[in-house]
Structures are given as structure tokens and as C-alpha cells.
């Protein structure tokens, strides 16, 4: 197999250890067959690698490539008109009566072909790739009928065939109750969400199962019925939970050994402790908090107290978080929620990988996937510090320039 040596760089390996960021000011890295074979101080490079083809990275910063672990980039239409309506004083109910809200996105998504869904998603994905992202989680959930949910997942899978990025799909059939099932959430779960999940799994379209546990969406017992099927199918789970109220969704997710609970603004200490016991990751989504002008913040201090890993993501979606910048999400997590820059970078590398169950991503330790982001900055704190500035020099995927 071809070896590649990357040297003359500042390495932020993001491994656990005594040094913040796993930082090595004069580092080097050897890749082979898509994996990190060796990383460490350049002065300690083993002699066996002396003749390996070398790439001088000009003293730039190298981190693991970024991971956006919670997105809705596949959808039809946009909701810019609602943004304007709200700023002109329209209430949520007035927007909904005018055909807005999730109903608008569901309608636009149901009428879009798979090719159209893919074509509209690719520019969003390109914006993420341009900021050093190598893994993107993509959810369904804007079809809310069997065929459209499948079409969304097929379009998500197709992204990975058109771009050099790893796609992880999440089935989100339990996202909202569609208008044609108004007042019949149980019937929707039984006749649409669960059959769609079984069919999508049979087609190999599902990497994980998600849901939205909230008063405006589904109750814990309804989510549990979907999770029972996910468990029977051997699929990992995650959950939108405690965003607008505390319904106990996080405790439910913990009882199923879920990978993550996402949003969690209203999570209490009992829920945090349940996450810790279950080994879950907390996914922080500052874009939605900002866009919705929320005031209840995620319990960051409690998450630290109970040592629950925190991931950070864009929540890219047409309604509550119309953003694709993971660097901006990092800055927001620091500014709005008081994460440290190191926590923010861990949240888009090591802990984002945990949130997706990807044990081979997120650090630059030997045996990890050699997906690198090379930055024109001197220190990793600069990635979360600057706003509206993209210092990416290049991505290196699988150790290949």
C-alpha cells in the first residue's frame, strides 16, 4: 500500500490527554490505506518512514476533518418568506395559517423528484465541504409519507456518490404529524412511520433512527413504538429531545441505549445523569436556538459535571436553522452557551463521531481514518474565534491529496 508522510505542521490530534487539543507544534503524520499509521512529534518520526513520499504543509494547522452530525440538508423548497413574515410581526399561528411552517417544507418535498432533492442538497453539502467537513449526517422527516421518506433517504445516499464525503442517514419518520393525520398521531406511527422504517431498512437506506419527542410532535410512548422496531432491526437510535419542554424524551432515549439526545435546552439533571449512565452524547444545536430566539440554554454545566460528551452541529434545515456553516456553529456554541474553543472543536470532531457511532473518526490517532483538515491558522482556537471567515487550506481524505 502507498504510504504518505505529512510534515512541517502543527498537529491538533483531538485525542484525550494532558495537552489541550492534543496539540503538537512541530508534528507529523503518516497515512497508509486510508488510515493514520503514525502521528506524533516530527523529531520522533521513526526511521522506517524516512523514505516515504513527503508532503510539506507549510507549518499549517492540521485537525481531523470536521463532522456535521445533525442535518436536514435534503428537502424541497425554502422558507425565506416565513422569515420575512415573522420579522414583520406575524405570529407562528399566522404563518401556519398562511401555509407555512413544516407543512410548507413537506409540500415542497413531496412534489420533488429524487433528482431534484439531490440537486438542491448538493450546494448545501458543497458549502459544508468547503469548511473542512468530511462526514455529514442527513435525516429524512420532510416526507411524512412512505414514498417521500424513502425518496429523501435515496437522495441522501446519492450525495455520497456525487461528492467526496461520507453520508450517514437517519430515518426521521416520527418528525411531525402531517396534516392528513391531524389528531391521529398513533395512526400515523402505525401506518406510516413504522412501515416506512421497515421498508427503508430493507433497502439499506438507514444508518440510525431518530424522532422528535415534543408536545408539538410525538409523545414518549409513541417514540418508544418506533424505537422498539429500530431495536428489533439492530439500528442505533438518537432523539430530538427537550428542545421546547421536558417530556422525558432523553430518559427514554437513554433507556434504549441511544447514541445521542439533540437540542436538550430543557434537560434537567436527572436526564443528564441518565445520559451519562447510558454513554450518550449531547448534541448542541446553537443555530436553532439563535434563529428561534430562544432563551432557555442547554445545561452545559451539568453536562460537564456528569462528563457527558458534547457535540456541536449546524442542524441545517429550512425552518429553524437555515445555516450550513459548522465554523459558525462552533462560534455560536462558544458565544451563546460558553463552550470553550477546545470543547467546540471536540464537538465537531471526536464527539460528533461518537454521536454517530463512528469509532474510526474524529481524532488523528493511529488506526483512525486519515481524513484531515488543513487550516491557514496558527492555533485551533482561531477556528471558533473568527466569524464569517473560512481559513481552510485543503481537505485530505483518506490520506490522499
From Swiss-Prot:
Cofactor: how bound: Binds 1 zinc or iron ion per subunit.
InterPro entries linked to this entry: Amidohydro-rel, HutI, Metal-dep_hydrolase_composite, Metal_Hydrolase
Designated gene of the protein: hutI
Gene3D superfamilies: Metal-dependent hydrolases (3.20.20.140), Urease, subunit C, domain 1 (2.30.40.10)
Full protein name: Imidazolonepropionase
Originating species: Ruegeria pomeroyi (strain ATCC 700808 / DSM 15171 / DSS-3)
Membrane-spanning segments: none
Binding, N-formimidoyl-L-glutamate: 142, 317, 319
UniProt binding sites for Zn(2+): 70, 72, 240, 315
Cofactors named for this entry: Zn(2+); Fe(3+)
Pfam families: Amidohydro_1
Classification of source organism: Bacteria, Pseudomonadati, Pseudomonadota, Alphaproteobacteria, Rhodobacterales
Binding annotation for 4-imidazolone-5-propanoate: 79, 142, 175, 243, 320
Keyword match Lyase: no
Amino acid at each position: 500500500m502507498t504510504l504518505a508522510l505529512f510534515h512541517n505542521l502543527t498537529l491538533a490530534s483531538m485525542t484525550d490527554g494532558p495537552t489541550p487539543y492534543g496539540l503538537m507544534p512541530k508534528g507529523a503524520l503518516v497515512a497508509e490505506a486510508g488510515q493514520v499509521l503514525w502521528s506524533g512529534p516530527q523529531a520522533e518520526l521513526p526511521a522506517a518512514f524516512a523514505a516515504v513520499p513527503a508532503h510539506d504543509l507549510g507549518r499549517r494547522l492540521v485537525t481531523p476533518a470536521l463532522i456535521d452530525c445533525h442535518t436536514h440538508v435534503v428537502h424541497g423548497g425554502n422558507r425565506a418568506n416565513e422569515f420575512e413574515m415573522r420579522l414583520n410581526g406575524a405570529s407562528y399561528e399566522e404563518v401556519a395559517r398562511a401555509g407555512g411552517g413544516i407543512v410548507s417544507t413537506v409540500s415542497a418535498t413531496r412534489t420533488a423528484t429524487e433528482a431534484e432533492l439531490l440537486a438542491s442538497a448538493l450546494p448545501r453539502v458543497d458549502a459544508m465541504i468547503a469548511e473542512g467537513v468530511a462526514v455529514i449526517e442527513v435525516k429524512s422527516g420532510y416526507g411524512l409519507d412512505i414514498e417521500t421518506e424513502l425518496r429523501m433517504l435515496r437522495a441522501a445516499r446519492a450525495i455520497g456518490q456525487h461528492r467526496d464525503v461520507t453520508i450517514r442517514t437517519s430515518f426521521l419518520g416520527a418528525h411531525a404529524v402531517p396534516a392528513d393525520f391531524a389528531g391521529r398521531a398513533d395512526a400515523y406511527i402505525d401506518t406510516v412511520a413504522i412501515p416506512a422504517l421497515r421498508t427503508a431498512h430493507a433497502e439499506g437506506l438507514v444508518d440510525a433512527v431518530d424522532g422528535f419527542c415534543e408536545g408539538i410532535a410525538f409523545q414518549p410512548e409513541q417514540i418508544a413504538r418506533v424505537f422498539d422496531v429500530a431495536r428489533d432491526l439492530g439500528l442505533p437510535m438518537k432523539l430530538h429531545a427537550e428542545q421546547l419542554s421536558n417530556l422525558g424524551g432523553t430518559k427514554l432515549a437513554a433507556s434504549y441505549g441511544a447514541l445521542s439526545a439533540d437540542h436538550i435546552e430543557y434537560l434537567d439533571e436527572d436526564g443528564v445523569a441518565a445520559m451519562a449512565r447510558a454513554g450518550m452524547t449531547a448534541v448542541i444545536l446553537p443555530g436553532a436556538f439563535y434563529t428561534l430566539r430562544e432563551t432557555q440554554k442547554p445545561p452545559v454545566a451539568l453536562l460537564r459535571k456528569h462528563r457527558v460528551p458534547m457535540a456541536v452541529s449546524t442542524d441545517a434545515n429550512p425552518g429553524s436553522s437555515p445555516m450550513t456553516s459548522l465554523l459558525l456553529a462552533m462560534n455560536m456554541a462558544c458565544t451563546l452557551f460558553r463552550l470553550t474553543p477546545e470543547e467546540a472543536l471536540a464537538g465537531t470532531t471526536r464527539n460528533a463521531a461518537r454521536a454517530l457511532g463512528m469509532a474510526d473518526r474524529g481524532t488523528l490517532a493511529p488506526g483512525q481514518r486519515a481524513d484531515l483538515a488543513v487550516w491557514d491558522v496558527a492555533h485551533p482556537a482561531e477556528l471558533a474565534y473568527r466569524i464569517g471567515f473560512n481559513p481552510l487550506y485543503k481537505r485530505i481524505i483518506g490520506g490522499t491529496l
